[in-house]
Design a protein with these regions (language model features):
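RNA-contacting regions in translation and RNA-metabolism proteins
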Residues: 1-233, 241
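Extended, polar beta-sheet/loop recognition surfaces of beta-rich domains
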Residues: 238
Length: 241
């Protein structure tokens, strides 16, 4: 029994050292009814990848190798309880840390990340070295770095944005691909702003089912009301324009 406890303790320590890392597991069972899958993580460890932690549209078969993000590891009497995910923003963040040398060595920093798994991720980056373009470093020559990650994520779109401590600049960049005319921070305790965009870019700014503006809000921490330039002119007095 003491030997088994020692093994469990060692197993827990090993898995805890892999928290917030990407690991590859092998599918050993698929629950067709619930959609959950069981992964063998090696060294006697296993974990369940629940349906709600899988990217929409993904399908798995026994024997398949799957990359997952280790969200948490809890030591229990029966061994480590490992929480894994493929939808967590940390998966994308860690992929960039491993793929981009400038992030790995600390020159470029990921300041914020927002993700709707399987559809789109927005990531804000900043460089400690003014000679290093943080966005270019993440994209890579001819898009090589970002394309590799997009491929691993099954075609998920990734917007890489230059982070700024100027919140107006940051919000404007985060709303890309739409071009912003004006950012107005609104008074009050909640972080809110009104963003004006050209009329023909309003639907682009809001995005499919509100996705673009929703990710922008998660990334910046601001509630965002997006309006068209015509709407602004119709509702504001001349001194506000």
């Amino acid at each position: 029994q003491g030997l088994r406890e020692g093994e469990r303790s060692l197993q827990c320590s090993e898995m805890q050292s892999r928290a917030h890392e990407i690991i590859t597991g092998t599918v050993t069972a698929v629950d067709a009814e619930r959609g959950n899958i069981v992964l063998d993580l090696g060294k006697g460890g296993s974990a369940v990848l629940p349906k709600n932690e899988q990217v929409p549209g993904e399908h798995f078969t026994e024997g398949q190798m799957v990359q997952v993000y280790v969200v948490d590891v809890l030591a229990t009497e029966r061994g480590p309880r490992v929480t894994i995910s493929r939808t967590h923003p940390g998966l994308v963040k860690r992929m960039f840390e491993l793929e981009v040398p400038e992030i790995y060595d600390g020159t470029v920093e990921i300041k914020a990340i927002a993700r709707e798994a399987g559809a789109r991720t927005k990531m804000a980056v900043w460089s400690k070295n003014p000679d290093v373009d943080p966005v270019g470093a993440c994209i890579g020559a001819h898009g090589s770095r970002v394309e590799k990650i997009v491929e691993e994520l099954g075609g998920e779109k990734i917007d890489i944005i230059r982070w700024s401590e100027d919140i107006n600049e940051f919000i404007s960049a985060a709303l890309s691909p739409a071009k912003v005319v004006k950012v107005e921070l609104l008074p009050g305790e909640t972080k809110s702003c009104r963003v004006t965009v050209p009329d023909h870019q309003l639907s682009l700014a809001i995005g499919n089912k509100g996705q673009n503006v929703r990710l922008c809000a998660h990334l910046t921490g601001y509630n965002i009301d997006t309006v068209s330039y015509t709407h602004l002119r119709a509702h504001e007095t001349p001194e506000h324009l």
